[in-house]
């Protein structure tokens, strides 16, 4: 006899917003979604900011969203986790940071601090540099040299002087720290093995070689005069007490996002490095805020938090058969991120990957591979052995990123057609579906003055639970979806899954 499946259907980038202007969700003809919405219990939940472990007011995204959904709790992202540790004071007790200080004291050497100097919050945050300066002050260090990388991508193209001035004011108020070198991120944060770029940054940092200026401000202004924006500022050195990185020194790299910090760290820490000629620093203590990759041998300030008892693991522990299904664009989200950063399948889990169409941009094919995803799912349902299904329709998000209203409306209409077939089939099997989203996007693809808006939104996302006779809580967050699934599956919720079922009892 066929099982009664419970499905989580994620309409990626589909949120609630009152205004119809630029709102593809409101303007699309979606009879199936509307039918379920009027027939079954509904609510809306938060998918951004503190509710998903991001700083207040920060829009959610698919990685963060799926991680919170799968974990069934708030998953604190690196930026928030570090901010919290600074606010709590734990930062100043951190073993790795204090080992760096001890190393400097034992060797009567210098502390060098690397990182992206901005408040973009994508790779780093300059307030974390300020916390490191506070730590150096508390511990009585006097030789602290900052090697700043300029942003101009996640913040305004020419905003570096603001951050430089604030940092210099911090040096002055604490009586510790000075700029040693400055590089545009184009050089210091390359990730494609363009060693000619990285070498210029390395020479300024390690060997104290390059154009020299009396101050960071003077060097940046000289680059501006050559029509270079922050990202492309050529590595230069700032005249002062620093003379490069020497034997026995310590480095702390405060970028928390690994991809653009790994390469430079590899130059310093990988003895087999051969991208260009380097002279290894002897007895160098090298710490990074997070683990960058396996080629980078460093002390790690904030170790990765392993997420246990995610929805997939709980399903496995209860001998449930589960399916993860999406097209290429969102396949990592329903697998790796939904499983808390785990690539391997759980026991009883199978996966279906449907290729996304090969087009330059998805506004050219708004239906993407939704119909193929739907067909594959119907095929899987026919096997009759599934307990849990996690499905993602990518269209509202991927087409929404075009900032084009008509294609985004078409994308939602295609998804609605597929939704109808999938949900009706699940209902025919006496199963249940939760229809929801991971963050907003297609709910606003135009600004108030009709310019394309390509970013996500912070609007709440809808939840429909296709079970008559139950009442849903009025509010919640993405971390409440896994507990709701377990509730529908009649499976106990583990204690580390701290979200709450949206179904009132």
Swiss-Prot record:
* A Gene Ontology molecular function term of the record: phosphoglycerate mutase activity
- Keyword Transmembrane helix applies: no
Q: Which residues does the entry assign to the active site, renumbered to this chain? A: 62
How this chain assembles, per its entry, is:
Monomer.
Protein keywords: Glycolysis, Isomerase, Manganese, Metal-binding
**Required co-factors:** Mn(2+)
Gene3D superfamilies referenced in this protein's UniProt entry, alphabetically: Alkaline Phosphatase, subunit A, BPG-independent phosphoglycerate mutase, domain B
Record-listed Mn(2+) 2 binding positions? 12, 62, 438-439
Q: Name one GO biological process term.
A: glucose catabolic process
Provide the residue positions that the database annotates as binding substrate.
123, 153-154, 185, 191, 257-260, 330
Entry's EC annotation: 5.4.2.12
Q: Which residues bind Mn(2+) 1?
A: 397, 401, 456
Name under which the protein is recorded: 2,3-bisphosphoglycerate-independent phosphoglycerate mutase
Which CDD domains does UniProt cross-reference here? iPGM (cd16010)
Q: Which reaction does it catalyse?
A: (2R)-2-phosphoglycerate = (2R)-3-phosphoglycerate
Free-text comment on the cofactor:
Binds 2 manganese ions per subunit.
A cellular-component GO term for this protein: cytosol
Function, as annotated:
Catalyzes the interconversion of 2-phosphoglycerate and 3-phosphoglycerate.
> What is stated as this protein's family in its record?
Belongs to the BPG-independent phosphoglycerate mutase family.
In which pathway does this enzyme or protein participate?
Carbohydrate degradation; glycolysis; pyruvate from D-glyceraldehyde 3-phosphate: step 3/5
* InterPro entries in the cross-refs: Alkaline_phosphatase_core_sf (IPR017850), BPG-indep_PGM_N (IPR011258), Metalloenzyme (IPR006124), PGAM_B_sf (IPR036646), Pgm_bpd_ind (IPR005995)
In terms of superkingdom, the source organism counts as: Bacteria
